[in-house]
From Swiss-Prot:
This is Enolase. (2R)-2-phosphoglycerate binds at residues 163, 338, 367-368, 389. Pathway: Carbohydrate degradation; glycolysis; pyruvate from D-glyceraldehyde 3-phosphate: step 4/5. It is an enzyme of class 4 (lyase). PANTHER family: ENOLASE. Its cofactor is Mg(2+). GO terms for biological process: glycolytic process. Disulfide bonds: none annotated. It comes from Symbiobacterium thermophilum (strain DSM 24528 / JCM 14929 / IAM 14863 / T). Mg(2+) binds at residues 242, 286, 313.
Amino acid sequence: MTTIVNVHAREVLDSRGNPTVEVEVILASGTTGRAIVPSGASTGQFEAVELRDGDKQRYLGKGVLTAVRNVNEVIAEAVVGMDATEQVEVDQAMLALDGTPNKSKLGANAILGVSLATARAAAAELGIPLYRHVGGLTARTLPVPMMNIINGGKHADNNVDMQEFMIFPAGAPSFAESLRMGTEVFHALKSVLKSKGYNTAVGDEGGFAPDLKSNEEAILVILEAIEKAGYKPGQDVFLCMDVASSELFQDGKYVLAGEGNKVLSTEQLIDLWDSWTRQYPIVSIEDGVAEDEWEAWVELTRRIGDRVQLVGDDFFVTNTERLARGIGMNAANAILVKVNQIGTLTETLEAVALAHRNGYSSVMSHRSGETEDTTIADLAVALNCGQIKTGAPSRTDRVAKYNQLLRIEEELGDAAIFAGTSVIRGRKQG
């Protein structure tokens, strides 16, 4: 009864009011799996192609009717009759149908929607949670949330250059407690910002988006908020950053527009990260140098990789070829996992497996354009990532994932393992 009998896509909206693709996969038993595809604002140039219509008269050119049509008329014909529990076969059939290296023919948004909906349908038919269906019996590690509480860069209309300043409540004993700690710091930050006369409106990912005196001030106000909430920085709650430095990279230099167009060389930027990670409890930096600066990644990793998690997002784009090259060069030590960067569940699993086999960490991640879909919460547990990035504890599109993780932790009961400080590099355990 796990045979796919119908596949249907429609155009729906994401958290930014932009169209995206929702797919339903219906099985012979009548069981349905549904998934909605997310979308990013700062996208790596090597990501799989998200198909947009380009009709300026409709949704400012961002419609996805072409991708929807590709699901309903092309992909459906190929996968109807296949077994939904054979995820690899379903994904491979779509990849063969597309035939391009970056999914530009059918669109990664079309292919991913079908891929994730297929997994959901299979799990529902088997009567097991999605994390168990994908990850098997070993899926029981709850991730530490990386909560983006100050938004900058492309995620906010402010003068903060770095895209995300995050808190990482790894000192908690459980996921539920880490979520509580992070949320209390988030509320404390609001009062800290208000006391300084700063705006407390939120950005795309639910974090605050104030204009600050400098990028470093973001760290200082967060440290103040951690203490105000009654926690110890570097013991209970740590800091993480997503620099999204490809967005700052111009003519071989890094330009900090929010600091009066301050220009830094690659060496100066690496010096800055070295300094900040010694001065502050920063345990993870994502995209610390630009996506094409391979030698800079090697140097950054050599300098601070033994004590700081260096995450490749735009650098790796959840792509096994780029990740394998990075591993070979000892560039970075962790991969950010975004299902829509690569475009199928199977390829996502392959990327995480490659990372883990080579001692690289993995961080499951949302996109800035999200929906009520909670698939990534299950995948974080399924793949034992130990870390998840899904925004501030604000906005339903972000909180939906946290609430799903609360359900999973409760369901696992005593079998649940909270990753905690075990994921922090250079930190002695016990």
